[in-house]
């Protein structure tokens, strides 16, 4: 019983600090308007940035994929589970997101977490130094730790500090690792400067474009395309359960890098391949993202971002200067943040409260996630509820 006692005490401590996380049950497709725990709500919690998760064409595509390929893959990618749908999607992703390198190739993963672990553990090891942004996603942090490489943390988005670290390093292999869009602040890494430093110091740049792919850049090709980067020393990870509206993730790089991952990336090799129907649906999603409808959705999303930025400035709390679909509003303490989120919840608005350890102590916040499925009226309701909450707390 000793372990249970330890766990129960740990949970009590989590509760005492206002850090208990609770799941909510969604009874409807992911969209701006959802049924959550039996209640009709406007959701500002998902990463469905283009509003594609319930798109009829994607629902039809995943249904068609299930009919064609069945319910499951039946094995790992190297042992019978690599379907035509997976192969086609990798070709589509290489063409869509691989414009930054000659001879691009893509590798499809079940999750973004797996893709980051696979990339860092396969490419880095003893004798490698990883230079990691202090606000990188947990999957990049864990991948770096598991790689057994030396890890140097540079201050968030501080290219000058990173340059000094690179200058002082005598590592045989150097990898700079960064999110493109940071998931809790919504800001964008100085990608052009990071690549400049990488090439000057003989390093590689690995970026996680989870929150940029589909939203940023020409035709939604991502943050790397928006920054017009091009280099054989660049590796891009992206996710397919956010703007793409389905599930999974990918790595795009020079074909030699991808072949190395196929041969050496344990999170890729030793797991069952994702369901082929999901891959089939993602290929359909890429056609929407890169077409006229995708551009219309991105334009609408940009208008929502501008409105939200203006609206948050009128609150008594601290908005983060974000030009992306992630719009944080820093409240401060855990208790106050939970109280504000609960007030919005009573107004049938689902806005998650983000607390440590996800964000630093004293910066607990509401994370307002915008989607092209939202309307201007949805934002007006959010603004009204925020103002009413602020008045009640004054």
Curated annotation (Swiss-Prot):
Source organism, top-level taxon: Bacteria
Named cofactor requirement(s): pyridoxal 5'-phosphate
GO terms of molecular function: 8-amino-7-oxononanoate synthase activity; pyridoxal phosphate binding
Keywords on record: Biotin biosynthesis, Pyridoxal phosphate, Transferase
Ligand binding (substrate): 21, 137, 358
Reactions performed catalytically: 6-carboxyhexanoyl-[ACP] + L-alanine + H(+) = (8S)-8-amino-7-oxononanoate + holo-[ACP] + CO2
Cross-referenced SUPFAM superfamilies: PLP-dependent transferases
Sites where the protein binds pyridoxal 5'-phosphate: 112-113, 183, 211, 239
Enzyme class: transferase
Residue numbers of N6-(pyridoxal phosphate)lysine PTMs: 242
EC number of this enzyme: 2.3.1.47
The protein's role, per its UniProt record: Catalyzes the decarboxylative condensation of pimeloyl-[acyl-carrier protein] and L-alanine to produce 8-amino-7-oxononanoate (AON), [acyl-carrier protein], and carbon dioxide.
UniProt subunit comment: Homodimer.
Protein's UniProt name: 8-amino-7-oxononanoate synthase
Organism from which the protein derives: Paraburkholderia phymatum (strain DSM 17167 / CIP 108236 / LMG 21445 / STM815)
Gene assigned in the entry: bioF
């Amino acid at each position: 019983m000793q372990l249970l006692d330890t766990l129960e005490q740990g949970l009590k401590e989590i509760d005492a600090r206002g850090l208990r996380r609770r799941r909510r049950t969604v009874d409807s497709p992911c969209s701006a308007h959802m049924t959550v725990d039996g209640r009709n709500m406007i959701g500002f919690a998902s990463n469905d940035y283009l509003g594609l998760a319930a798109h009829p064409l994607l629902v039809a595509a995943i249904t068609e994929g299930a009919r064609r390929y069945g319910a499951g893959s039946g094995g790992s990618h190297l042992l019978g589970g690599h379907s035509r749908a997976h192969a086609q999607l990798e070709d589509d992703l290489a063409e869509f997101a691989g414009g930054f390198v000659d001879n691009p190739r893509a590798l499809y993963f079940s999750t973004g977490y797996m893709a980051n672990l696979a990339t860092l553990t396969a490419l880095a090891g003893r004798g490698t130094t990883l230079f990691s942004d202090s606000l990188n996603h947990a999957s990049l942090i864990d991948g770096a730790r598991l790689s057994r490489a030396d890890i140097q943390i540079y201050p968030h988005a501080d290219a000058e500090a990173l340059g000094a670290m690179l200058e002082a390093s005598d590592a045989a292999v150097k990898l700079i690792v960064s999110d493109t869009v940071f998931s809790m602040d919504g800001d964008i890494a100085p990608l052009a400067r990071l690549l400049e430093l990488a090439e000057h110091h003989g390093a590689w740049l690995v970026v996680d474009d989870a929150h940029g792919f589909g939203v940023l850049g020409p035709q939604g090709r991502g943050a790397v395309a928006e920054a017009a980067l091009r280099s054989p020393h660049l590796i891009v990870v992206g996710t397919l359960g956010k703007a793409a509206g389905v599930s999974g993730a990918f790595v795009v790089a020079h074909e030699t890098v991808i072949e190395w991952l196929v041969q050496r990336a344990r999170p890729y090799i030793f797991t069952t391949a994702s369901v082929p129907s999901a891959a089939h649906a993602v290929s359909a999603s890429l056609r929407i993202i890169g077409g006229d409808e995708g551009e219309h959705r991105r334009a609408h999303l940009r208008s929502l971002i501008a409105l939200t930025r203006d609206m948050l400035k009128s609150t008594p709390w601290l908005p983060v200067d974000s030009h992306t679909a992630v719009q944080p509003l820093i409240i401060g303490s855990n208790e106050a943040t939970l109280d504000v989120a609960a007030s919005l919840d009573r107004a049938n608005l689902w806005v998650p409260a983000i607390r440590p350890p996800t964000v630093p102590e004293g910066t607990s916040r509401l994370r307002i996630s915008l989607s092209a499925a939202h309307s201007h009226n949805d934002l007006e309701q959010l603004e009204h509820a925020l103002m009413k909450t602020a008045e009640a707390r004054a």
